[in-house]
């Protein structure tokens, strides 16, 4: 529409004066006045919207829509803008018409953007008049249409943006910062207000301060840590530690002892082990107080055995006799054998050693298995040869378990202890913890009697009371070659030295069950004879059919059935109590 008006006005101005052109000019002026009023309304709307939409001031930089798009009513092409100034130069009343359209057709980027916010019914896109055009295009006459165009010609202020409305904040006034507050961004407790030099102590200074002025909590932690360290250190070397001092003197290495103890822990006897250790500690204390001399003798014997049988067999016999005499006077161990029997299976040899001490204390300890075992083991000097040293170590382990057998209320318990290879190990360790484990054990393998011999001995043992100890000793520990000499020697020593082990078993059985324990004697003989599982099997055989040897031993030991039955009963009793 605007373009048509401009096109019409330009030829009229060029043609000259006439009635038709004058009427057209007046009509154009009226139309232009209406347009100005509409533009003023649009400007007001745009200003109000710009205040709200100023959040996107970058839109003002957008270019006007391309000329290819159909311009809305009132918009003129660039051609019209150029023709309008030319028309103003021509004299005549129609000069006004083209001048105003020129002013409104002048494109400006700001109105074009703001017009995009206009409602759809707004016909004009270019709503902002170019203020500078009136200077070039001539001012309108005041009489005709000066006032409305003048109002529209006043250049509107640029719409305010959000940035203009935002008040700048004075950070220094809001946050009272000072040079000393460089670290205030770090949290500082209200209770602790430091001066600037105290805020950044060096790590060394801080450590020095904390260490020089320890808190009560730190002191308590220090004391507890010291106590633990001292306890752990002393427990290693203390004779009351799980690994007794006698064990440390054994010829067997500590690694073997550890492996044996680990093997026990793998079994389901943890509770039993704990109880056994408690009993062992109490027994050791009682033993130390009541039998210091016995401990000296045992230590000397163990030392001699650690020296690989430097002492002669007679010395061993003497030690065993002395120990037995002392044992007779010792009070019985507080924990009875049935109590300890369960531990014999799964407890490390150190505990088995405590069980040996129990046997010593008990009135029947005269037949203390440890001494008896040691004596028969020591009898065969042949076993002390270097070739038999490995056997000796095994024998030591078997001997350790032997005290368990003596401790056992019945041969069944002893056999059960030795039934597993672990029990065999414990017996060996026990023997080694006893005296002369190394040399005695090596002799034992050579002295182990054949099953037939064992059977014969078992029968004899079962029928005979404690005095039969001597034949038991000779049979159990002496090899077939040495049997004659060993048996005679054992009888000479009254079973205390040579036949000490079988005798101790038999006597202890008498004390506990009142029945000779040929089973124990045979088992102990087998154990002493070899650090091999076979002796352990024989021991088990007395009451347990676990091992092949155990079964034949059973048959051999059958004559003393009352003893085996008692042992089985006791075995069941202690099992019930422990588990």
From Swiss-Prot:
Q: Where is the composition biased (Pro residues)?
A: 63-73
Can you cite an annotated GO cellular component?
A: cytoplasm
Q: In which residue ranges is the amino acid composition biased (Low complexity)?
A: 9-21, 141-154, 244-253, 289-305, 374-390
Protein's UniProt keywords contain Transport: no
Q: Which UniProt keywords apply?
A: Coiled coil, Cytoplasm, Cytoskeleton, Methylation, Phosphoprotein
Coiled-coil region: 21-56
The biased composition feature labelled Polar residues covers: 233-243, 362-373, 412-432, 502-516
Q: Which InterPro entries match?
A: Slain
Q: Asymmetric dimethylarginine (modified residue): where? A: 469, 554
Phosphoserine-modified residues are 241
Tissue specificity, in the record's words, reads: Expressed in embryonic stem cells. Expressed in adult bone marrow, brain, kidney, lung, testis and thymus. Expressed in colon. Isoform 1 is highly expressed in brain. Isoform 2 is more widely expressed in bone marrow, brain, colon, kidney, lung and thymus.
Location comes to: Cytoplasm, Cytoskeleton
Region Disordered, annotated ranges: 1-21, 60-95, 135-162, 233-258, 289-313, 347-454, 479-516
Q: What does this protein do?
A: Microtubule plus-end tracking protein that might be involved in the regulation of cytoplasmic microtubule dynamics, microtubule organization and microtubule elongation.
Subunit composition and interactions: Interacts with MAPRE1, MAPRE2, MAPRE3 and CKAP5. Interacts with ZDHHC17 (via ANK repeats).
- Name the family: Belongs to the SLAIN motif-containing family.
Protein name per UniProt: SLAIN motif-containing protein 1
Q: What taxonomic ancestry is recorded?
A: Eukaryota, Metazoa, Chordata, Craniata, Vertebrata
What would be the name of the gene that encodes this protein? Slain1
């Amino acid at each position: 529409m605007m373009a048509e008006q401009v096109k019409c006005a330009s030829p009229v101005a060029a043609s000259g004066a006439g009635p038709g052109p004058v009427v057209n000019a007046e009509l154009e002026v009226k139309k232009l006045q209406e347009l100005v009023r509409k533009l003023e309304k649009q400007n007001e709307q745009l200003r109000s919207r710009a205040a709200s939409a100023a959040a996107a001031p970058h839109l003002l930089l957008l270019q006007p829509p391309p000329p290819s798009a159909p311009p809305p009513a009132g918009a003129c092409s660039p051609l019209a803008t150029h023709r309008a100034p030319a028309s103003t130069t021509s004299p005549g009343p129609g000069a006004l018409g083209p001048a105003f359209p020129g002013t409104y057709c002048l494109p400006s980027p700001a109105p074009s953007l703001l017009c995009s916010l206009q409602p759809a019914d707004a016909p004009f896109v270019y709503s902002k008049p170019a203020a500078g055009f009136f200077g070039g295009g001539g001012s309108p006459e005041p009489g005709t249409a000066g006032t409305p165009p003048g109002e529209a010609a006043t250049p509107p202020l640029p719409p305010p943006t959000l940035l203009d409305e935002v008040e700048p904040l004075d950070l220094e006034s809001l946050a009272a910062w000072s040079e000393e507050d460089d670290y205030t961004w770090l949290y500082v407790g209200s209770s602790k207000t430091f001066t600037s030099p105290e805020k950044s102590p060096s790590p060394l200074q801080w450590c020095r301060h904390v260490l020089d002025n320890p808190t009560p909590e730190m002191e308590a932690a220090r004391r507890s840590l010291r106590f633990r360290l001292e306890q752990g250190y002393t427990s290693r070397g203390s004779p009351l530690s799980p690994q007794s001092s006698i064990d440390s003197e054994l010829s067997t290495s500590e690694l073997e002892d550890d492996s044996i103890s680990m093997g026990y822990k793998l079994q389901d006897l943890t509770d039993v082990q704990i109880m056994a250790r408690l009993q062992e500690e109490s027994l050791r204390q009682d033993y130390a107080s009541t039998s210091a001399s016995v401990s000296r003798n045992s230590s000397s014997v163990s030392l001699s055995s650690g020296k690989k049988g430097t002492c002669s067999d007679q010395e061993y016999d003497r030690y065993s006799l002395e120990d037995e005499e002392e044992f007779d006077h010792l009070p019985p161990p507080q924990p009875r054998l049935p109590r300890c029997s369960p531990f014999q299976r799964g407890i490390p040899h150190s505990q088995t050693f405590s069980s040996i001490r129990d046997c010593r204390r008990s009135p029947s300890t005269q037949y203390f298995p440890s001494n008896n075992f040691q004596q028969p083991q020591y009898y065969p000097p042949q076993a002390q040869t270097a070739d038999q040293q490995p056997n000796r170590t095994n024998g030591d382990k078997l001997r350790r378990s032997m005290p368990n057998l003596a401790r056992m209320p019945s041969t069944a318990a002893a056999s059960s202890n030795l039934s597993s290879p672990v029990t065999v190990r414990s017996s060996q360790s026990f023997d080694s913890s006893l005296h002369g484990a190394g040399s005695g054990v090596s002799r034992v393998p050579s002295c182990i009697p054949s099953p037939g011999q064992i059977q014969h001995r078992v029968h004899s043992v079962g029928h005979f009371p404690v005095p039969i100890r001597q034949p038991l000793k000779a049979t159990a520990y002496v090899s077939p070659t040495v049997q004659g000499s060993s048996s005679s020697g054992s009888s000479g020593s009254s079973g205390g030295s040579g036949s000490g082990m079988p005798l101790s078993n038999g006597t202890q059985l008498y004390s506990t069950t009142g029945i000779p324990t040929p089973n124990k004697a045979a088992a102990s003989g087998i154990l002493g004879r070899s650090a091999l599982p076979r002796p352990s099997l024989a021991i088990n055989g007395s009451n347990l059919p676990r091992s092949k040897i155990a079964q034949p031993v059973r048959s051999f030991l059958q004559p003393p059935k009352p003893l085996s039955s008692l042992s089985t009963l006791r075995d069941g009793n202690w099992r019930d109590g422990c588990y």
